[in-house]
Amino acid sequence: MTIKAITFDLDDTLWPLKPTLIHAENETYEWLKINAAALTNQFSLADMSEFRFRLFKEDIRFKNQISQVRKETIKAFALRSDYSEREALELSEQAFSVHYQLRQKVNCYEGVEELLSNLSKNHLLGTISNGNADVKQTPIGHHFSFALSAEHINSSKPDSLIFDTALSNIESLLGQRLDPSEIVHVGDDFLCDIVGAKRAQFKAIWLDGHEHKHDCIKKHEFKKENTECRQSEGLSDGLSKKLSEEIVADAIINHIKDLPAALLSLSS
């Protein structure tokens, strides 16, 4: 079957997340030191990170809203530091703006730019991400015809809604109905990307090679739950394990540069 479109995860698939995120968080905290000393004199970056993670995990309002969680965290600590409601809100918006600009300063893996340039000649390309990076603000953004994020759809991988939305986008852009199996999704997280894509009847290629990626799920072995993905669809540990054991990627690659060969094998 001819592959008509390819969708990509972003973080830890096209670029490493950790260096960008650490830099953005550190620089945002430095900004707060200058602009909200009363806050940073009392609370550390670690304090804020722990609060943010707990808020994301426990408060259903922020289930798919990473950006809002960051704003709410800064606002909460500003209020604890005796800033007024108005001042706390302004600080949260300004600090998040600093963070968000830095969040887009990604360094793609070797070969990604050339890969996307070549693939875009014959395939429609899009992105499906649970993160809040705006791929259109990155150096590779021009290669993609659409970009979906969990917070804009209010649905996270592996939930079928975000994949169904991708299918609708692709059909609209191509002006034709597609079988979902004519779309390939590429990602590093087995539960979010591979389980999600296969349940939506997409083809799925698992990028299982970067040393920074979560070592949580092997092809038939569930080692550690992925909290973000499981939360997004209310998946229990047992169901997550069952899905990971039953679903197999259509291809597995160790580096993003190996993708063309994997795509060729799926087309033959």
Predicted segments with their positions:
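N-terminal helical cap/lid subdomain that shapes the substrate entry/recognition surface
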Residues: T2-E110
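Asp-based, Mg2+/Mn2+-dependent phosphohydrolase catalytic module
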Residues: M1-I6, K18, I34, N41, ...
